[in-house]
């Protein structure tokens, strides 16, 4: 499809994808059938031709809603008719996940995407609006800089080319491509906090603070991400200099709390801030004390933190 044949919204989405996949041989697109990911998938066809890249689309069916199989099949058929390589992957979501159904679905979805992708990058359709919502949720939870930095453009194999694109643009892009995206009923369900942020909080913030509030929140996330990377690099340098091992963290007493917190976070990447602070609390407690963390237990002995991993 020539550049001039795309409508303005579709072109904005397609160019965002092109900028990210330039120089990539092959990539995978995760798609739910909703407007963001459907626009991403169609834009990827345009971008892959311009960049001479191969692209596959994976539609993940979480099997959590009645009719989800029909949505997945319909989305695949639409993309195949548009000349794309598309497949459906069905996943089982752990209903007992302690982090809740949304986190469990995310874990299952990403595992399915990586299974198809191998070592290829996986593109996801998060927009600037998603970024703004993520920052607000992190603020409400009292999160640190890593979470407040929001969604990174590249996070391992998962790439997010649409972080400078508004949700309204992906919706309009679907109109310009003359496709009807699936509307996830969960997106408007007030039982879900993210849905309430989207449908209740953001409209009020835009009314009070102006229509560019999402852009401002996203810009703050970008600034924090750059600073967070510097802090992480300093923490890793400190760990190298002090002989930190996978199960052993010495010499943390007397270190400034900001650096100490990040050293522990790098040492325990699955830990949340509540776990990190609990581990730091061991530094001022009696020897032999310990705290449970994801995957194991940390104990303090003779000024050194030890991690006993849970099998």
UniProtKB/Swiss-Prot annotation:
Enzyme class: ligase
Reaction it catalyzes: cytidine(34) in tRNA(Ile2) + L-lysine + ATP = lysidine(34) in tRNA(Ile2) + AMP + diphosphate + H(+)
Protein localization: Cytoplasm
Domain of life per record: Bacteria
Residue positions binding ATP: 32-37
Keywords assigned by UniProt, alphabetized: ATP-binding, Cytoplasm, Ligase, Nucleotide-binding, tRNA processing
Keyword check for Ligase: yes
GO terms, molecular function: ATP binding; tRNA(Ile)-lysidine synthase activity
SUPFAM superfamilies tied to this protein: Adenine nucleotide alpha hydrolases-like, MesJ substrate recognition domain-like
Main location: cytoplasm
Any Pfam family matching the protein: ATP_bind_3
Protein function: Ligates lysine onto the cytidine present at position 34 of the AUA codon-specific tRNA(Ile) that contains the anticodon CAU, in an ATP-dependent manner. Cytidine is converted to lysidine, thus changing the amino acid specificity of the tRNA from methionine to isoleucine.
Free-text domain note: The N-terminal region contains the highly conserved SGGXDS motif, predicted to be a P-loop motif involved in ATP binding.
Protein family: Belongs to the tRNA(Ile)-lysidine synthase family.
Protein name (record): tRNA(Ile)-lysidine synthase
Organism the protein comes from: Cutibacterium acnes (strain DSM 16379 / KPA171202) (Propionibacterium acnes)
């Amino acid at each position: 499809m020539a550049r001039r044949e795309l409508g303005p919204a579709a072109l904005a989405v397609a160019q965002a994808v092109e900028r990210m996949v330039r120089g990539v041989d092959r990539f995978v697109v995760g798609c739910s059938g909703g407007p963001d990911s459907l626009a991403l998938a169609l834009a990827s066809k345009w971008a892959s031709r311009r960049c001479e890249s191969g692209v596959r689309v994976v539609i993940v069916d979480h099997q959590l809603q009645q009719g989800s199989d029909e949505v997945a099949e319909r989305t695949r058929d639409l993309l195949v008719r548009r000349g794309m390589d598309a497949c459906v992957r069905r996943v089982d979501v752990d209903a007992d996940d302690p982090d809740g159904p949304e986190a469990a679905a995310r874990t299952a979805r990403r595992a399915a995407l990586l299974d198809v992708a191998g070592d290829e990058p996986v593109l996801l359709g998060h927009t600037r609006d998603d970024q703004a919502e993520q920052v607000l949720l992190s603020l409400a939870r009292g999160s640190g800089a890593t979470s407040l930095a929001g969604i990174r453009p590249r996070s391992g194999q998962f790439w997010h080319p649409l972080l400078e694109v508004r949700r309204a643009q992906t919706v309009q892009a679907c109109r310009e491509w003359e496709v009807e995206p699936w509307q996830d009923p969960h997106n408007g369900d007030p039982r879900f906090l993210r849905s309430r942020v989207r449908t209740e909080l953001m409209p009020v913030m835009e009314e009070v603070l102006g229509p560019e509030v999402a852009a401002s929140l996203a810009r703050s996330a970008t600034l924090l991400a750059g600073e967070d990377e510097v802090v992480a690099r300093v923490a890793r340098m400190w760990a190298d200099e002090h002989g930190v091992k996978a199960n052993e963290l010495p010499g943390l007493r007397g270190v400034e709390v900001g650096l100490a917190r990040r050293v522990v976070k790098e040492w325990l990447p699955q830990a949340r801030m509540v776990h990190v602070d609990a581990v730091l609390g061991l530094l001022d407690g009696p020897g032999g004390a310990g705290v449970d963390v994801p995957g194991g237990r940390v104990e303090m002995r003779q000024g050194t933190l030890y991690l006993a991993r849970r099998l």
